[in-house]
């Protein structure tokens, strides 16, 4: 079964490379693909983390006898910060990849030394350098001599499962909570709740475009755009329909968004 493909754009055509679980990939269920600043391509799956250097794959999996192995095989989030550090978010915690030893840091711990075993949904570096993670807990991560520590800030929002995050141009943090809508957290720790009574709708992605406009991809309500003067999200209809399921948003040109 072919599951993963690289596409190279050439002057007179296109070339493809196909990879399968028979020989290369650890799983057919891919959660995230990311290329780091060194050109390495990382593929997060539900059964291990894969790294491709252009010639071969290396598969990383959990080894219960090695605390510097992947802490869980279900990998959902990958994030490279401004210092080039690669964070790996799993079903059971967050780690840093160490290229010098080709291994991973010990799992993050809370300030009291207890293991931070949160199911990590997303990772974000804010403009002030803070690293935020979402999942079972919405918190910040600090790094001291390679050790990760999780900090629980006092936030004016429910502590339930949080999914995706972005920081807008005004330094507001937007946090989605699935069927519970989306929260906007301002720098002065005030919050506003949007779409809190939208039944039959789940937010699965959010995006800020080049103009600073915020969009939500949803299952049940299609694409929504934030109207800043009215402080509300409005539907973007396709052929008069609002319920077209949208799962992903990216910008492909100055004036075009790609929806999936």
Task: Kindly give the residue locations of the regions a language model identified.
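Carboxylate-rich, polar loop motifs that coordinate divalent cations or form catalytic acidic clusters
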Residues: 1-260
